[in-house]
Amino acid sequence: MTVFFGDGTSQTSAAGASKLVQTVTANSKTQYSFTSTSYVDTDVTVNITPTSSSNKVLISCTLATQCYATNSTSLGVRLLRGSTAIWNNNEYHWHSVNAAINLSYSSFFQYLDTPNTTSQITYKLQGARYRVSNGTQQAYFNYIPSNSSHGCIIIAQEMTP
């Protein structure tokens, strides 16, 4: 279906801002526990095949995360395009309280990628536990026992330049 604007142009012919070409969404409710500073694959993945090599792909992620520590710890999150890391944050969810408590969050980040291809791309999230200290540390995706409806969502949107 083509949407036409008041001036007679359509989504595909109007000049100006980027246009949305396609959207692909995936989600995961699989619980992941990260125990080391080595990044581990998750099933939080989405596949998209760009229609033009000049188009960009906007990745949007909503994550259900938790950190527990008797001292301090953090959850590291990394975004891959295929096997290449294109974004990471070793302190995405940081627990710095010197007390044995759980800190749970639903959080969001975006990354605008320029993949320069028309082949299928797999975007994937990895996780790791960072800021290792004395005592007990735990870092999780999808570990929110009081609300089982939480999960991680990843969205890939192809956009014209």
What positions do the PLM features span?
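Terminal beta-strand-rich extracellular "head" domains
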Residues: 26-27, 33, 38, 49-161
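Extended, low-complexity regulatory regions
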Residues: 44-48
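Glycine-rich, low-complexity segments
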Residues: 1-31
